[in-house]
Amino acid sequence: MRALLAIIRCDLLLVIRRKSEVLTALFFFVVVTSLFPLGIGADAALLRKIAPGVLWVAALLSTLLGLQRMFAADYQDGALEQLALSPQPMVLLVTGKIIAHWVVCGLPLVILAPIIGVQYDLDVSSLYVLIGTLLLGTPVLSLIGSVGAALTLGVRGGSVLLSLLILPLYIPVLIFGAGAVYAQSVGLDASGHFSLLGALLILALACVPWVSSAAVKIAIE
């Protein structure tokens, strides 16, 4: 546990020193989600209808922006090789990096999304559902993304390949996350979508760290 916290703290300190990387993803999310109300106009019914899809797609793409850097810096300076030689299990170190990525790229979106949701005339209950789906869904995005980030380590044009690998795997999260918000906005029960998102999160937590750690080991060998 001490090693896990050390990895998280180290990654967060590095992010604080490179604030522009985090701000770029947040700025992208805010700009993309704010352009739709400006382009569509004051049609509240239409804005409520498109809000779940727009907000979730923007969150997905914003998360994707920071994935390439999850392991890249440590790979380039040799830190990953040193971590692999440490007595701590690689899966623990990879988990720390995934958590740090979510804190930096996912958690700010959870905080910002309700504010953006007001532009789409979402009611309070829909905003609560939006927060809940993002809390369940964004960790899944970071977990799945870690596999792509590990598989593309040291690969030329890795960012393009990463997108091609990861985006199809993001589709279930997008469907269930946006579907829950839409169901709530039209007065339907969103509990089924929450259950499916929770199942995806549990499955990802159980499998992905081991897959990512194996991919990292292959990349550094």
Question: What do the predicted segments below correspond to?
Answer:
Residues L205-E221:
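Junction motif at the cytosolic side of a transmembrane helix
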Residues K19-G41, W56-A59, L165, L169-F176, ...:
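Hydrophobic alpha-helical transmembrane segments of multi-pass membrane transport/permease proteins
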Residues T95-Y120, V140, I144, G177-A178:
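Hydrophobic alpha-helical transmembrane segments that constitute the membrane-spanning cores
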Residues A51-L67:
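Long, hydrophobic alpha-helical segments
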Residues Y128, L135-L167, K217-E221:
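A structural motif at transmembrane helix-loop-helix junctions in multipass membrane proteins
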Residues G39-I50, P114-L135, L153, V181-F194, ...:
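Membrane-interfacial helix-loop-helix connectors in multipass membrane proteins
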Residues M1-A25:
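Aromatic- and glycine-rich beta-strand/loop motifs that create alpha-glucan
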